[in-house]
């Protein structure tokens, strides 16, 4: 197999410089796939850096790349947080280990001869390939096991963390082909792959990825609308696209929210005590759960419905659905309520066979058969919020649980606003908040699922502001903001961190630092490509 020249070790290149390049490829390759390989790669990087020696020269190089120091100083902030941690063993080790790359990756990138731009672009291509391959693997597994949940379409890491990489790859592949002056066919192919990945993302309905995707679209349109070098026509077109996009977003929110918050007068019970077969209805008047405005637990003739269901379905009325999830019965009640049907034989007879198959697959509302997955996910989020408002219990609802944790985290932050509860004190802080709220949720030892709140409760306002200033100084001093991929990565992270504490995990931290190192340290001082190399 013939490798392009820029992938081979160059004559004027040391072994350690080549190892650095290969390890960056490895990081990009394993970002969406293997936490172990990310750790192993970074260990090899550090061992090679130590073995290279020349520490005096490296100190000089670090002094010439002061932007790297700003990133490196993030780590000592969290080390300092150890000194006021309530429980020194409460995630302290994991909290620090996952932040070590803040210290090591910028240090190594600043003190070594950088790869040329052809190599840096190749690293980014490897990232796109890895993300695309992971999506293909997820789809293949779904064809083998159709009962798998949509979150399992990310087979190797959490869908929350893979989702941000997926959004990045969607836009990065287009930037790479345009920046490399690729052929017209290559550009068409890049748009095709980007489109396929976009469809995959929309079909998954992953809320964090959807929010990041919409945020990037908004950022790009704003950028075009206010870019000085653009023509008036182009800026006007971007403005029109912004208005259209905002209109579509509002339409999607209205369409999915209306059935959830629509509450018509409750149906009359008197005079409707019996089914057509003469069986008495049962009503849970204390349970006002609704589907499309209709009460779920009113007008139930359970024995009659059980008999009718078991005659038409191979799934037991009191058993599990196709996905193996308990309580198929509640899904039947919800679906029939969404259609405005009473829960009896007559109501079940009104359902088509395809609707029974949908119920067996866990579909709780007939509207979910008409909508694409991303609208379904938005509708589910509204429904969770409504149920949380109605009962005050977040159990079983992912978004409601996040809201409960955000409230608890804010309560904990209000108790210790300046320095927080310490680097390892996140569980202690959140438990305090949940107990103070007298939360009905029994789960404890959780994180707030919000990066901003996580920093506020662990290192306080002072630590949070310090980290924010250090990252801002890195961005401005390094000139990373001039590179579109870096800015897209920041938009993705900043939006996604509202719903997940991403930088408390290795994969998103490495994702952030890889792009920060490439565009904030290596790209500007990278040698100009040699003749025949990729851009």
Range-by-range predicted roles:
Residues 2-7, 24-28, 42-58, 168-180, ...:
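Hydrophobic, aromatic-rich transmembrane alpha-helices
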